[in-house]
């Protein structure tokens, strides 16, 4: 299969079909461990949302993430996006808060069912955002954000809680001269940028991921879903750009109307003080006809 026939691994649909399926669970574990730097070390996980084909066909506007439980009371949510569509930081926090709240309720309900004393159990939630475009000003390709007190003159930097952690992986910032095949973070970022990168083809995990990608790319139904998904994503971005342009134009129109109203008000004051129509036109920029109508 030639390179041109491979579907884009950075598509959220294709990414999930490669990494978010049970048969490739060990690939997902490898990817997560490489990003988390084995803190914690994931040895097994349960993928929580594997069903996607029906969802994608019925609702093409959804975001296809991978949700997994990596340890008891510890969850990971992985998102991949080709483009920076804006407000990524806010959405990342929102998604993690929703996962934390949902699983907090589930843990509390389990205690209730077991007849135990009900207490709020807060799970740990880790968000991983793999971005095709840059979203931070940080120099490194992988950065972790957490909830913390910033340093002051009297206090040091202090992490408030380890319950919420967010990792941003910015593929545009990854351009090493040499890929260390023993460093799986390098390997996976290279794969996500170019699955056919010659430097990583002898890595067993890459071979397995690439075989899956080739199978998906050769499947007629999978390609149909992929192109439908791409069409919808591009349509969404275009609609968003149009909406932004319309909002900007509306803002400019309001500014023009406000400026015109201020000129009219100034012209009326000048008329009341006996200034000539010609002078008022010169001072305000209003035409002679506009001044005469006041």
Question: Which residues fall in each region the model found?
Answer:
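Accessory alpha/beta interaction modules
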Residues: 1-165, 175, 246
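Low-complexity, glycine/alanine/valine/leucine- and proline-rich hydrophobic stretches
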Residues: 153-167, 183-195
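Short, charged alpha-helical interaction segments and adjacent helix-coil junctions
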Residues: 2-4, 67-72, 76-81, 179-182, ...
